A protein has these predicted regions:
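Conserved RNase H-like, two-metal-ion catalytic cores of nucleic-acid enzymes
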Residues: 1-93
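Conserved structured core elements
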Residues: 41, 60, 98, 130-133, ...
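Exposed alpha-helical structural elements
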Residues: 42, 65, 99-102, 124
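Generic alpha-helical structural element
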Residues: 55, 92-96, 125-128, 132
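Short, surface-exposed acidic
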Residues: 73-78, 110-119
Length: 153
C-alpha cells in the first residue's frame, strides 16, 4: 500500500533565515484529523514510511525549507506532489494566483485567516496550519484523477 501524506509547514516570514514553527500532516484517505507537530524531526520520524508527500507550493518552499532545516534530503523533490504545479497544468485559466486560498474558495473549503505574527509559534498558528491541510486534502481529492492517471503524466 502506498502512503501519501498531506502536509503544510509554518515558518518565520524570512525565507533566508526561516525558523520552523509547526507542521500539520495527515495520511490521504484516512478518517482522522491532521496531526500537529512543533518538532520537525519528530514529524519526519513519525512519517518516515510515507511514499509521497502532497504540499501546495511544496517544490517552491516546503520541501527545500524542510531539507535546509534538517540538513539533509529528508524529502526528495521527486516524492513531492505539488498541487500548485498541478493546478497550473490542469486549470491554468480557471485560477489567477493558484493559491491555496483561491482554490479552496472554489472548492468551498475555506482556508481561514491568521492575523498573528510569524516570529514565534502560537496556538492560532497551529490551528491555521491544520486548516491548511484540510484545504489541501480537498485539493488533493480534486486533482487526484489527473495525478493518478498514467496517460496524463
Amino acid at each position: 500500500m502506498k502512503y501519501i501524506a498531506i502536509c503544510d509547514i509554518e515558518t518565520t516570514a524570512l525565507p533566508e533565515a526561516g525558523h520552523f514553527h509547526c507542521a500539520a500532516v495527515k495520511i490521504a484517505g484516512k478518517d482522522h484529523p491532521p496531526k500537529l507537530f512543533t518538532d520537525l524531526n519528530r514529524m519526519l520520524s513519525d512519517f518516515r514510511y510515507v511514499d509521497k508527500w502532497v504540499f501546495h507550493n511544496g517544490l517552491g518552499f516546503d520541501v527545500p525549507k524542510i531539507n535546509e532545516l534538517v540538513g539533509y534530503e529528508a524529502i526528495k523533490p521527486e516524492d513531492c506532489i505539488d498541487t500548485m504545479v498541478v493546478s497550473k497544468l490542469v486549470d491554468y485559466k480557471k485560477f489567477n494566483t493558484h493559491s491555496l486560498k483561491e482554490i479552496g474558495v472554489h472548492l468551498k473549503v475555506h482556508k481561514g485567516d491568521y492575523d498573528g505574527g510569524w516570529d514565534t509559534y502560537t496556538k492560532e498558528m497551529g490551528e491555521y496550519c491544520v486548516q491548511d491541510v484540510v484545504v489541501l486534502e480537498a485539493l488533493w481529492e480534486y486533482f487526484k484523477p489527473y495525478i493518478m492517471d498514467p496517460s496524463w503524466a
